[in-house]
Amino acid sequence: MLDLTNFDRIRIGLASADHITTWSHGEVKKPETINYRTLKPERDGLFCERIFGPTRDWECYCGKYKRVRYKGIVCDRCGVEVTRSKVRRERLGHIKLAAPVSHIWYFKGIPSRMGLLLDMSPRALEKVLYFVSYIVTNPGDTPLFKKQLLTEQEYREFRDKYGTDFQAAMGAEAILQLLDEIDLNELAAELRQEIRDVTGQRRIRAIRRLEVVESFRKSQNSPSWMIMQVLPVIPPELRPMVQLDGGRFATSDLNDLYRRVINRNNRLKRLLELGAPDIIVRNEKRMLQEAVDALIDNGRRGRPVTGPGNRPLKSLSDMLKGKQGRFRQNLLGKRVDYSGRSVIVVGPSLKLHQCGLPKEMALELFKPFVMKRLVGDGHAHNIKSAKRKVERVRPEVWDVLEDVIKEHPVLLNRAPTLHRLGIQAFEPVLVEGRAIQIHPLVCTAYNADFDGDQMAVHVPLSAEAQAEARLLMLSTYNILNPKDGRPVTIPTQDMVLGIYYLTIERPGARGEGKAFRDVNEAILAYESGVIELHALVKVNMGDGRLLETTVGRLIFNEAMPPEISYINKLVDKKELSLIVDRCYRRLGYKRTAELLDGIKQLGFKYATQGGLTIGMNDIVIPERKKEILGEAESHVEMIEDQYRRGLITFDEKYRQTIETWNRATELVTQELLNTLDRFNPVYMMATSGARGNIQQIRQLAGLRGLMADPSGRIIDLPIKANFREGLSVLEYFISTHGARKGLADTALRTADSGYLTRRLVDVAQDVIVREIDCGTDEYVEVGDVRDGTEIIEMLQDRIVGRTAARAIVHPETGAVIVDADEEILEEAAEKIVAAGIKKVAIRSVFTCKTRHGVCKKCYGRNLATGRVVDIGEAIGIIAAQSIGEPGTQLTMRTFHTGGVAGEDITQGLPRVEELFEARRPKGQAIVAEIDGLVEVREVKGRREIEIRGENGERVQYAIPFGARLKVQNGDRVEAGDELSEGSVNPHDLLKIKGPAAVQQYLLREVQRVYRMQGVDINDKHIEVVIRQMLRKVKIDEPGDTEFLPGSLVDILDLEEENRRVEAAGGSPATSKSVLLGITKASLATDSFLSAASFQETTRVLTEAAIKGKVDPLLGLKENVIIGKLIPAGTGMNRYRSVEVDPAVETPAKEVPTH
């Protein structure tokens, strides 16, 4: 077996026949599998014990040797080695092929590697390999030329004419001979010369051929290894055969495919021994080739081989591919023991760091711990009797269980786990019943509710795992959301409503204006019924000042930490969030957890005491509604009349009608808000942020308003009724369009958003904080992000928690606000904005020079903790989750914007995808390529723009029909400016203005989509992904470097190679920046394991094998695949080598657990 600790890279290559034979434990000669009577494997068959090892531990086939004491002996009767049966998962067999066959990956892949090496078209190659045409291998003294194809007829004619002067053959043997004759060094030199001499298509073809030749040269692979003479047979446990109830067998498809190969191979051997006619042998060889093709990649060429019911059989390639393939099913996601799942219910009495675990579940999960403790405490003599006690659930077991779970955190996970807050650690509390109890405040992070959601529980076993769960994953440490650094564990719904009710004031309430000596007296007066909860009273706060406040606010402030000043205002959800944030920043995790529990108790208590429920009478319909709608109707009739008389067009009529109804809806809403009492529960729920919004109240008590039809166009007939009055049939029908579209959209959105997250994770997974400072001099200047005149994101939000690249000085006083290389804190950011500074130079992930990751200075603050990021933090994954998780909230398809003549602009999720995949946008804007003056003119009925540059150069652009211009005659433009409305093609921008402009453009556009939906994401997450999209450059002229023209190379690799060449006096390579979409960037990574487990598995592995690629195992994914600890967090080498020195004794300190 692999020893996972002592290797740090893994290489893939082509295997020669000798390699395969040395790895193999024996040749599979027969197609038999298992004897149906004895149910034992047949000798020399596909499950043979002599080749693959015994089916039972320490027992040979014939039963002569049983028991572990014969370990390692090979039985003299049956030839089976006495060993563990699990060797049947790792021992390889082989089939010696009677004729060479080609490997379909290298012949059929795009581009065909064999075809490029031999300079043959894939079609010609196919004719030779499948015995349709002959190929000349040695023309001798004839007018034929090497690699010329001959049909059967031509071959016969030339044979008659020239006899044995030339050699021609067909099948894989002929190709094998040609591949053996290739001199790679000579061919490489010829191709380099050709690249210098020719242009156009021929040059491109030469470059592609040189790439393959160089791959073979560097990897020490021989081209002839693409033709197989020995076929490996994978271990039998990986292609199992099991007996079903009815005595029938269920088997893996691979066994069928191997059986076909063995049958055809044995038939071919027999035919060759018999000296059968050429045509029969040829047919058998072709069938063998096809059988091997089907085994390796069924369906790649021709029709796939099907099993019962016309189902294509799953070949070796299919075993690796897709969600059910080896990579994604077994290597990246495994089943976990010590886990369970159950329905969740609310546990309002739990503390923030606790969860309620059902007793039966806890007993099963902690079974080994309980058994060990039972033996240790003397309740049982040995493990066996302890196990019996647990299974029979004796009374003493419960006491031991109570003891065992103390201080032993468990992990709770809710699918879908969209971000790191989807798994958190809690201390379990045993509860009756069979449902897991969840603290109400962690529901937001999990996006959980109690309508039947289920959650999974996992038990961390080792001491290290428990320590990590407690110190890093405990729910009290997950108060901030990693995507924007704001609190995510904040009271919601009934708690918000309760606090709102508690802190609201009611003018004229009983006891208003009374004064009290201190807080206690005021509360006593309330409890005695002298004053009401909401009455404004004066209270002496102990420092001599009388404060006008309400008893409710006094009670609320009792729950506040003394360090936070008295909160004397109506507290809604926003205010609560600010309070939690302030408490966390000033007082830390523990005190915030206590505060949250306090607010939770108060909220529930007063929501109950206030009796805040909804009844029909709470929905009050405004009296003026009829009047307002009457006025609107008469106005619409007037517009209709104008249209009939031909005074306005249909479009104008439509637009004016919609404006009229919108105005009417707005008036009704205003009336409604004026009508509702401030203590009306419906109104309170909406204004406090507990549930619902004004729009929903409007539909309940006002009117439903305008609706959209299936295409998204607004129907100009509004629904005048509201839900309290009830809808007519027509009104109900109109409103179903939107409802159905909403449901369909949600379903699509979830899938699309999940796929986007997967691609983002893949592109950024190896971005880890690797060092403190990369030492770069480069920086990025940031200011407010604007969309026209509207500010999308303010300067202050953009610079908090970032590192200043240069000292930031007050423009008037000259005082230094922040030093260079220092973190910009909240107070400093406020000072910077107050000083009127509009642009700030900060360190950014964009300009970080750290290899395979980023440095602490360029990244800045870790938003999940509010402190500077630690080395080893997997910020790439966090970035991907932060962008992907809100993706589900973004709307789908395109919006029809009123007024723009039929122009759709892509918005929401599709726009984010378009940006990250660097696609050409729909409705593309024309971009100026040079600086100069604009002239708009009409030529032959079409408009065009001409830009006249300073030095006389002119560029013309044709304007597509219906495009709206952003510039006018005589305007001055700079390169990169948009000339027409629409989205800019990022590739054009990269060509014209360079990488920095593209980075800022993509950042701005992605932020714009999220901000429109009211989602806040910190810039740095988007920067991490964009940086990964711009990692590569395309080589123009390789100079004296090792690179090939047109190849994609990492920027840092290019700089390093250029330095090496220049030091040796050579000429460096020149290159141009390229922008890769996230899918392309993921596949262009250094790690072939990561790329293969993402998409296009066979293509990635084919290329990697030919290049003999080495995977340096730097990312997370490739380490998960081979089962090593990930090189992030506590899995980093710098943390792994820490050893505890027991020599120094320190007195134990009492550590309170929450």
Curated annotation (Swiss-Prot):
The RNAP catalytic core consists of 2 alpha, 1 beta, 1 beta' and 1 omega subunit. When a sigma factor is associated with the core the holoenzyme is formed, which can initiate transcription. It comes from the Bacteria. Binds 1 Mg(2+) ion per subunit. InterPro entries: DNA-dir_RpoC_beta_prime, DNA-dir_RpoC_beta_prime_bact, RNA_pol_asu, RNA_pol_N, RNA_pol_Rpb1_1, RNA_pol_Rpb1_3, RNA_pol_Rpb1_3_sf, RNA_pol_Rpb1_4. The keyword Zinc applies. DNA-dependent RNA polymerase catalyzes the transcription of DNA into RNA using the four ribonucleoside triphosphates as substrates. PANTHER family: DNA-DIRECTED RNA POLYMERASE, DNA-DIRECTED RNA POLYMERASE SUBUNIT BETA. This is DNA-directed RNA polymerase subunit beta'. Zn(2+) 1 binds at residues 60, 62, 75, 78. One of its GO terms (molecular function) is DNA binding. Its cofactor is Mg(2+); Zn(2+). It is an enzyme of class 2 (transferase). Its EC number is 2.7.7.6. Pfam families: RNA_pol_Rpb1_1, RNA_pol_Rpb1_2, RNA_pol_Rpb1_3, RNA_pol_Rpb1_4, RNA_pol_Rpb1_5. The keyword Transferase applies. It catalyses: RNA(n) + a ribonucleoside 5'-triphosphate = RNA(n+1) + diphosphate. GO terms for biological process: DNA-templated transcription. It comes from Desulforudis audaxviator (strain MP104C). GO terms for cellular component: DNA-directed RNA polymerase complex. Mg(2+) binds at residues 449, 451, 453. Zn(2+) 2 binds at residues 774, 848, 855, 858. Keywords: DNA-directed RNA polymerase, Magnesium, Metal-binding, Nucleotidyltransferase, Transcription, Transferase, Zinc. Belongs to the RNA polymerase beta' chain family.
